[in-house]
């Protein structure tokens, strides 16, 4: 099984790395003076600017950039909220689904606008086709484009010197959508349709079962209702944009959302495709490709470590089964391991790899149920989120988060040798460190605060369906997921309540936009600084030494913050299994 695991993970990484250079180079050109494919995309881009009255040549101060971004996303949230509340009276609702409740609509609007895609509802029984397409799918595009725009603003701040502007938000948003996200989503959605992913406006179909079954109360069930809908178009961008919200309740474990091994591989690859390629884009835009490779190496090493942990823990199986004499070890006749909550068509390796990739990348989609993982298997995706979603992370947001950690790393290195820290020729001073501290602390505070409120209040405990350490893990996972804009969940928590919808919605908004503003502030501050020539005392930020330092900073800051909480959840649960 070890060789099988290595081969499957190796193929995935090889294909991913093969896509980094061409896509990264293309995206660097998109954000340059003369983007590619202007003959096709140029007229569409110019038409949008003309209709909206945008001066594409006018650049913005970081404060104006932030105001435009916040205003755009606030309007998007209001529209999505209103669409959900009115869906019962709108077309493309063949199942005649009622309006979404106020608290659930708020939570969903906050979730999709913040690129979290946390879902406290079941998509096929809650959202009409119009809401899925016009509301959720549109936000999948623009929330991803928002993250990419912030990243490009930060990169410009690092690369430029003695200027007060970092670009134009409207141009960056438009180009991210038209030149990058839409073409990739179109290709992927058509490919997914070829694999059997549904794309139709037909209502749900009731079919006769070939083999009727008798349920627990003795009733014979001879029919099944199969949910349909325009799923492929939403699934493509939910993966490419690291959104993660599924069309169906069980997300990519659903046979009509992820039917074949090829669809599984393509959806998995799509999660990391843009975040990985943006590292190369970063290197090109700052004039040193080695910087991009160093960041990519850091992300890949951390991801591999947690993937090995998850695969090993799941393949080892459940100690409780072994005590009962159940054989769950790999052999010629069975795959072995902990297959509870997993699709046998994907197996342990593809399930555990997806679990770590989706939580490393702030995607949150699932092809297995994380709540059914072993304690250490569930700890791996939880910790990847708690690191701040910087191990690849969301499109744009992951890389700008890792660049903040890089700034902290050079600051720590500067303290150790008594030099003023600098990153890519720019001095890192008090203002940058204050903003970086905010970016690091806000998700941690929100995670621990919401966990504490939930476990200490009757409303929070009422829908925790497991007791003890695992029940605590479910609450901690939900708070971690919302506060780090991931969206995955331990499904044993009943989260579609006013309590969780409200608190998790607040966490998603705070952790998204309270991080974006200080990131843009750092971009503006760095853009106004002069370039410092390199000297013998300059810390190279492209070497294996710096990669090791950066990994250490990410792990120490993330791990130390949450060790007490993890000790009450997955760690103690693991120890109890061994008793």
Curated annotation (Swiss-Prot):
GO terms for cellular component: plasma membrane. Coiled coil: none annotated. InterPro entries: KdpA. GO terms for molecular function: P-type potassium transmembrane transporter activity; potassium ion binding. It is found in: Cell membrane. The keyword Cell membrane applies. The chain crosses the membrane at residues 1-21, 64-84, 135-155, 178-198, 265-285, 293-313, 398-418, 435-455, 503-523, 549-569. Keywords: Cell membrane, Ion transport, Membrane, Potassium, Potassium transport, Transmembrane, Transmembrane helix, Transport. It is a multi-pass membrane protein. Belongs to the KdpA family. NCBIfam families: kdpA (TIGR00680). The system is composed of three essential subunits: KdpA, KdpB and KdpC. Part of the high-affinity ATP-driven potassium transport (or Kdp) system, which catalyzes the hydrolysis of ATP coupled with the electrogenic transport of potassium into the cytoplasm. This subunit binds the extracellular potassium ions and delivers the ions to the membrane domain of KdpB through an intramembrane tunnel. This is Potassium-transporting ATPase potassium-binding subunit. It comes from Herpetosiphon aurantiacus (strain ATCC 23779 / DSM 785 / 114-95).
């Amino acid at each position: 099984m070890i060789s099988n695991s290595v081969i499957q993970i190796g193929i995935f990484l090889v294909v991913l790395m093969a896509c980094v250079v061409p896509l990264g180079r293309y995206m660097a050109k998109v954000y340059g003076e003369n983007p590619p494919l202007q003959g096709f995309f140029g007229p569409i881009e110019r038409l949008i600017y003309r209709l909206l009255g945008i001066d594409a040549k006018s650049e913005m101060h970081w404060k104006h950039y932030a105001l435009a971004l916040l205003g755009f996303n606030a309007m998007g949230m209001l529209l999505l909220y209103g669409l959900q509340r009115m869906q019962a009276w709108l077309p493309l609702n063949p199942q005649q689904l009622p309006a979404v409740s106020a608290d659930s609509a708020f939570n969903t609007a906050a979730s999709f606008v913040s690129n979290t895609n946390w879902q406290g509802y079941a998509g096929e029984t809650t959202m009409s086709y119009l809401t899925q397409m016009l509301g959720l799918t549109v936000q999948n595009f623009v929330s991803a484009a928002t993250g990419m725009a912030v990243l490009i603003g930060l990169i410009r701040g690092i690369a430029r010197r003695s200027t007060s502007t970092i670009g134009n938000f409207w141009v960056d948003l438009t180009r991210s959508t038209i030149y990058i996200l839409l073409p990739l989503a179109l290709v992927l959605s058509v490919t997914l349709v070829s694999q059997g992913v549904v794309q139709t406006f037909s209502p749900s179909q009731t079919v006769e079962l070939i083999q009727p079954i008798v349920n627990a109360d003795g009733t014979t069930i001879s029919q099944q209702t199969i949910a349909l809908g325009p799923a492929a178009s939403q699934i493509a961008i939910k993966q490419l944009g690291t959104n993660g919200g599924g069309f169906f309740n069980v997300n990519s474990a659903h046979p009509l959302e992820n039917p074949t091994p090829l669809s599984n591989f393509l959806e998995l690859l799509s999660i990391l495709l843009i975040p990985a390629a943006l590292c190369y884009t970063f290197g090109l835009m700052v004039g040193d490709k080695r910087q991009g490779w160093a960041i990519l190496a850091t992300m890949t090493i951390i991801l591999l470590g947690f993937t090995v942990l998850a695969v090993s823990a799941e393949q080892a199986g459940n100690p409780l089964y072994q005590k009962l004499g159940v054989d769950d070890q790999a052999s010629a006749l069975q795959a072995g391991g902990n297959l509870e909550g997993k699709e046998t068509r994907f197996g342990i390796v593809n399930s555990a790899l997806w679990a770590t990739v989706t939580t490393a990348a702030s995607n949150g989609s699932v092809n297995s149920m994380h709540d059914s993982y072993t304690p250490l298997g569930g700890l791996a995706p939880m910790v990847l989120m708690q690191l701040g979603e910087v191990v690849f992370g969301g499109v744009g947001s992951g890389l700008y988060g890792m660049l903040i950690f890089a700034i902290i790393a050079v600051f720590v290195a500067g303290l150790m040798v008594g030099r003023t820290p600098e990153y890519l020729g720019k001095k890192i001073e008090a203002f940058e460190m204050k903003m970086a501290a905010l970016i690091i602390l806000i998700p941690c505070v929100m995670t621990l605060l919401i966990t504490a409120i939930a476990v200490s209040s009757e409303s929070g405990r009422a829908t925790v369906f497991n007791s003890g350490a695992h029940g605590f893990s479910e609450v901690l996972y939900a708070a971690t997921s919302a506060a780090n804009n991931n969206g995955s969940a331990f499904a044993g928590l009943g989260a579609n309540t006013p309590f969780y919808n409200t608190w998790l919605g607040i966490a998603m908004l705070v952790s998204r936009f309270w991080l974006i503003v200080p990131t843009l502030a750092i971009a503006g501050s760095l853009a106004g600084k002069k370039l410092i020539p390199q000297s013998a005392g300059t810390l190279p930020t492209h070497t294996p030494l710096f990669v090791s330092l950066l990994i250490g900073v990410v792990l120490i800051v993330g791990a130390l913050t949450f060790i007490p909480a993890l000790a009450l959840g997955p760690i103690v649960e693991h120890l109890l299994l061994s008793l």
